[in-house]
A protein has these predicted regions:
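Conserved AdoMet/S-adenosylmethionine-binding subsite of the radical SAM
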Residues: 68-197, 202-209
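Canonical Radical SAM [4Fe-4S] cluster-binding loop centered on the CxxxCxxC motif
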Residues: 2-39
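Short glycine-centered, acidic/aromatic-flanked micro-motifs in structured strand/loop junctions
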Residues: 3, 60-62, 159, 198
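Amphipathic alpha-helical segments in well-structured domains
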Residues: 34, 76, 179, 212-217
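Short Fe-S-cluster ligation motifs
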Residues: 39-61
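Glycine-rich beta-strand-to-loop/alpha-helix junction loops that act as flexible
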Residues: 60-65, 97
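Binuclear metal-ion centers of metallo-dependent hydrolases, dominated by the metallo-beta-lactamase
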Residues: 212-234
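Short, well-ordered amphipathic alpha-helices
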Residues: 38-46, 75-82
């Protein structure tokens, strides 16, 4: 499900690794209305149901940050209602960068979903800002952690591991110091699932390195030993 403009990315992060490219300055982004989203989804679900097609999950992601949509709560309410009508066993999932968790309506909407896949790319302010380039330059890991804590572990934590350089600054969230800080964050949040992955497509910053699977497995191992459910995509 795409709630952002089709012609350009709209996001509260400007991640160096984002497959959608860099943010573009847009004064008045045009978003689909709640009514348009509902109508399009109902039409699609009706067709799929009529064809007796299998539907496992309805996922919100796409060309930016879906929770930026001003009617995100209403859209999720509509989606859950339509899901219940057409595919009651299907899940509703949202991929989010966690920046809008200070909004009660967004938190309420996410709690209605079956799967909340929430990002934390680094557990230090310096590395988080170098990787994610938040539009709100004052955003801190402490703030993100506090807001993620609202879900009491009932979410999937998503982290992209990478190395490289951007604007003359080193980027590496795989150093012992960065990984140790991230482990501490994981233990504080205690998510029900952890998803760690590597860059796999063209990135806006060209000077980035894909982390080998063996290294990703080494990062995952101590968490698995503690009983965490860790998915490695590499």
């Amino acid at each position: 499900m795409e709630l952002m403009p089709l012609a350009h990315k709209l996001c509260s992060f400007n991640c160096v690794y984002c497959e959608c490219g860099w943010n573009e300055p847009v004064s008045h982004p045009v978003l689909p209305t709640r009514e348009e989203v509902k109508a399009a989804l109902e039409k699609k679900l009706a067709v799929l149901s009529g064809q007796h097609s299998v539907l496992d999950v309805i996922t919100f992601s796409g060309n930016g940050e879906p929770t930026l949509h001003p009617d995100f709560l209403g859209i999720i309410e509509d989606t859950c209602a339509l899901r219940d009508r057409y595919y009651p066993s299907a899940k509703v999932s949202v991929l989010s960068n966690s920046t809008q968790l200070g909004r009660p309506d967004v938190v309420q909407a996410l709690k209605m979903c079956d799967n909340r896949i929430l990002k934390l790319d680094a557990a230090t302010d310096t590395m988080m800002r170098r990787i994610d380039l938040p539009v709100n330059e004052g955003l801190t890991v402490k703030t993100l952690m506090e807001r993620l804590g609202q879900f009491h572990g009932d979410f999937t934590l998503q982290t992209c591991f990478l190395r490289g350089e951007h604007d003359g600054q080193s980027i590496d969230n795989t150093t012992p110091e960065e990984v140790a800080a991230w482990y501490e964050a994981v233990d504080r949040l205690h998510p029900k699932q952890i998803m760690i992955y590597v860059i796999d497509r063209k990135t806006p910053e060209e000077h980035l390195e894909k982390i080998p699977r063996e290294e990703m497995e080494r990062i995952a191992a101590p968490l698995r030993a503690k009983g965490y459910d860790v998915i490695v995509s590499a």
